[in-house]
Amino acid sequence: MFNRAVSRLSRKRPPSDIHDSDGSSSSSHQSLKSTAKWAASLENLLEDPEGVKRFREFLKKEFSEENVLFWLACEDFKKMQDKTQMQEKAKEIYMTFLSSKASSQVNVEGQSRLNEKILEEPHPLMFQKLQDQIFNLMKYDSYSRFLKSDLFLKHKRTEEEEEDLPDAQTAAKRASRIYNT
């Protein structure tokens, strides 16, 4: 089972992460460590599924996970093509995050809240202004605290430790971490 986990892990990594240009294997010469990417910008963090997972864990502890969930829901919404699906998703976003009765209400300016009537004619950018507000809230508030958090620093230390391990040990350690979390 352990060998299958390592094998699956290896298959998921892009070829550029597995071999250098000379064909030699290198775990310590990854393009850029994930924590370094995350620390570079909130955008980088939100583009990385592992980064989103860690950021959500942090926000959950801070009782503000709804911010990243709203941001992600808006990103999904912008990619939708089907009008009926857009209407359903728009109503879901509104009821979950924006209405006065929302279960996970986000903190946006009062005038920025959408009127329910606008949900009947959705368009991909209808939540953009609100999404930008939440992004900036995360960027200038939660994100900076995340970069100083034990959660982030622990992940960074783990990456640094793995950098010093031979390839087989690194893959085994990653597989162990993935299947034990």
UniProtKB/Swiss-Prot annotation:
Keyword Nucleus listed: yes
One Gene Ontology cellular component annotation held by this UniProt entry: plasma membrane
Classification via PROSITE patterns: RGS
Protein name, UniProt field: Regulator of G-protein signaling 10
Self-association state and partner proteins as the record states: Interacts with GNAZ, GNAI1 and GNAI3. Associates specifically with the activated, GTP-bound forms of GNAZ and GNAI3.
Species of the source: Homo sapiens
Purpose of the protein: Regulates G protein-coupled receptor signaling cascades, including signaling downstream of the muscarinic acetylcholine receptor CHRM2. Inhibits signal transduction by increasing the GTPase activity of G protein alpha subunits, thereby driving them into their inactive GDP-bound form. Modulates the activity of potassium channels that are activated in response to CHRM2 signaling. Activity on GNAZ is inhibited by palmitoylation of the G-protein.
Chief site of localization: nucleus
Ranges of residues in domain RGS: 41-156
Gene3D superfamilies, A to Z: 1.10.196.10, Regulator of G-protein Signalling 4, domain 2
GO molecular function: G-protein alpha-subunit binding; GTPase activator activity; GTPase activity
Ranges of compositional bias, category Low complexity: 23-32
InterPro entries in the record: RGS (IPR016137), RGS10/12/14-like (IPR046995), RGS10_RGS (IPR037879), RGS_sf (IPR036305), RGS_subdom1/3 (IPR024066), RGS_subdomain_2 (IPR044926)
Subcellular location: Nucleus
Coiled coil (residue ranges): none
GO terms, biological process: G protein-coupled acetylcholine receptor signaling pathway; G protein-coupled receptor signaling pathway; negative regulation of signal transduction; positive regulation of GTPase activity; regulation of G protein-coupled receptor signaling pathway
Disordered: annotated segments: 1-32, 158-181
UniProt keywords, alphabetically: Cytoplasm, GTPase activation, Lipoprotein, Nucleus, Palmitate, Phosphoprotein, Signal transduction inhibitor
Modified residues (Phosphoserine): S24, S41, S176
